[in-house]
Design a protein with these regions (language model features):
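Extracytoplasmic Ser/Thr/Pro-rich, glycosylation-prone low-complexity segments
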Residues: 1-167
Length: 167
């Protein structure tokens, strides 16, 4: 079993960048997205996702990233029905106002973009979840993706179980 990558700097060791203190591209701390420029890791052209390159990725507090636009929906849907490019390690109704935080780290030397949802609480219910997604540059804007689940205590944040996958 893989363990979450730490030692990335910042207040908790999972990255210098903190969701709750960042400028939101859409939504709020409960159902919001921030835009992260990924060119320091993937080069000036950006990251290639199924033939389209993006210089920025939207990190959503509800456990997913999107490429073409931010998402503010709190209810997860079947990933194949989402309709926009996305990768979801754990798309559910996360509410960091109730606990936890989201960190991210861009490491050009290692060629990684690491996003950590640390001790995040559900909108309704109890418990916390910790999980991580790492995008690794494999050259020419291409990448590999790794999901790491540390401690999952809940699967249903409000309506519907968590969704995992990509589209």
């Amino acid at each position: 079993m893989a363990t979450m990558v730490s030692g990335l700097g910042g207040p908790a060791g999972y990255g210098e960048n903190v969701f709750s203190t960042s400028t939101l591209a859409a939504g709020n701390l409960d159902d919001g997205s921030i835009l992260v420029d990924v060119t320091s890791v993937f080069g000036g052209a950006g990251i290639n996702f199924f033939g389209t390159t993006y210089t920025g990725i939207y990190v959503n507090n509800n456990g997913l990233i999107t490429f073409s636009s931010p998402v503010t929906a709190y209810t997860p849907i079947a990933i194949e029905g989402y309709g926009s490019p996305a990768i979801a390690p754990f798309w559910s109704d996360v509410d960091i106002n109730k606990g936890g935080e989201i960190y991210w780290d861009l490491d050009p030397t290692a060629g990684t973009f690491t996003i950590t949802w640390l001790n995040v609480a559900p909108y309704t219910g109890t418990g916390t979840n910790s999980f991580q997604m790492i995008l690794r540059d494999t050259g020419s804007g291409d990448f590999s993706v790794e999901f790491i689940y540390d401690d999952i205590q809940w699967t249903n944040g409000y309506r519907g179980d968590a969704t995992v996958g990509f589209t």
